Amino acid sequence: MLSVGDFARSKVFYDKLLRFLGFKLKHEYGNMAGWSNGETLFWIAAADAHGRKRKYRKGDIGFHHYAFELASRGAVDQLGRFLEDNGMTVIDPPGEYYGRNYYAVYFADPDGMKLEAMIWAPPKPKRAAKSKHKRS
């Protein structure tokens, strides 16, 4: 569960984002909401009064960032356009990071929490060359 500073604002943000990613709002209890894509749940909840006094800072105890794994580079590109079209903060545009096999877009939620959508295709192992000589 992710604690958020302004539940109403964050719910609008995450509802748009998660619906785009194929999730549906399944649960809502007061200041908590949960979405599902049939495989996993993603929850947000209002931070308590003490927590709302502090701003998210990457490097503090807690999440560094949260990543969603997508099915293809095209899906990452589509999300990048969706983020821009909806005025969401893009930190790093769709591109290759950490090498050619890692393709991602980085963006921020209303509290500045860093989010990522990525596809990682590990390199395929090289197959041994076929011998031109017949075995007897």
Model features per residue range: what roles?
Residues 48, 117-124:
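Short beta->alpha transition motifs characteristic of CBS
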Residues 1-11, 66, 121-136:
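N-terminal beta-strand motif that seeds the catalytic metal site of vicinal oxygen chelate
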Residues 3-47:
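Core segments of cupin and vicinal oxygen chelate
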Residues 50-56:
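Short beta-strand/turn micro-motifs at beta-sheet edges
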